[in-house]
Amino acid sequence: MKFLAVVSLLAATALALPNAGVVHPTFASADKYTLQQAQNKCGEHTTLSCCNHVSKVGDTTAFNYGLLNGLLGNAISGPEGVGILSGCQKISVTALIGVDDLLNKQCQQNVACCQDNKSVATGGLINIATPACVALDSII
């Protein structure tokens, strides 16, 4: 009976939430760069990609008190956050004739730079191997 009550409460909460509607990119770099500029910013050994899902990591809040105040600073995570992306599809730069076209003609979502090499995860309790994709705007 308790299980049914909890499930009903969760279902009612989910139905009461507002509709997300149109999803806008977290990192809106598609309007800033042409295809060639974006590929140059990604660099060698990476692939320009269009990604569905963003996990923004690295946002920190600094507290200016305590014994170890500022000892690590932003060494563990950056102050602005880095976008780690998944659900990515490769954008073919070489096959496109209009290299000077803006990225938004090819990608309406989040533009990222993904590793070319395959990720390998072995020897752990839980192994997950996914290619690392970082948002184009996260790259300096």
From Swiss-Prot:
Q: What happens when the gene is disrupted?
A: Does not affect the formation of the rodlet layer.
Which Pfam families did the record assign?
A: Hydrophobin (PF01185)
Listed as disulfide-bonded, the cysteine pairs are 42-113, 50-107, 51-88, 114-133
What positions does the record give for glycosylation? Answer: 117
Q: Which GO terms describe its molecular function?
A: structural constituent of cell wall
User: What is the residue range of the signal peptide feature?
Assistant: 1-16
| Keywords of the record | Disulfide bond, Glycoprotein, Secreted, Signal
Cite the InterPro entries for this sequence: Hydrophobin
Q: Could you tell me the superkingdom of the organism this chain comes from?
A: Eukaryota
Q: What induces it?
A: Highly expressed in biofilm conditions and during infection in a mice invasive aspergillosis model.
What's a GO cellular component annotated to this UniProt protein? fungal-type cell wall
Q: Where does this chain mainly localize?
A: secreted
Intracellular or extracellular location(s): Secreted; Spore wall
Family statement drawn from the similarity comment of this UniProt entry: Belongs to the fungal hydrophobin family.
Q: What does this protein do?
A: Aerial growth, conidiation, and dispersal of filamentous fungi in the environment rely upon a capability of their secreting small amphipathic proteins called hydrophobins (HPBs) with low sequence identity. Class I can self-assemble into an outermost layer of rodlet bundles on aerial cell surfaces, conferring cellular hydrophobicity that supports fungal growth, development and dispersal; whereas Class II form highly ordered films at water-air interfaces through intermolecular interactions but contribute nothing to the rodlet structure.
Subunit structure comment from the entry:
Self-assembles to form functional amyloid fibrils called rodlets. Self-assembly into fibrillar rodlets occurs spontaneously at hydrophobic:hydrophilic interfaces and the rodlets further associate laterally to form amphipathic monolayers.
* Full protein name: Class I hydrophobin B
Organism, by scientific name, is Aspergillus fumigatus (strain ATCC MYA-4609 / CBS 101355 / FGSC A1100 / Af293)
